[in-house]
């Protein structure tokens, strides 16, 4: 129920909230990872050869990592951590690039989502982390934010004449 409100606010307990969180974990997180892994072996991520759509998803991954690192470490705002991962997972499920590099970027996104959610939902994340090909999530290092992934190659600028 950490996504329901900031820790300093009270909220009314709801079975619907528990059911919604369970449904999101099962359908959005678990099923997305299972479907992704069913695609077979993954190539190594080659940042230099990414398309603009792949770069956009990768930017979202690293923006989410940076935001959640701040939310966990400084702000203790667990509800915004969950919201950020939900937003990232929405982008992942809408991403339709099944090329090798597209799948590699999705793998990076799913790895980040599981690692971010692990302090909040440790049991399911432990299993998903191992399914993604890693060891024990309890001893995993936080993923570093790639500053180059945060750079935008095209910026829209409105100019009034």
Predicted segment positions?
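Long, charged, mostly alpha-helical binding arms that flank functional sites
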Residues: 1-104, 147-149
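Basic, alpha-helical terminal appendages of large translation-related enzymes
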Residues: 10-15, 93-104, 108-161
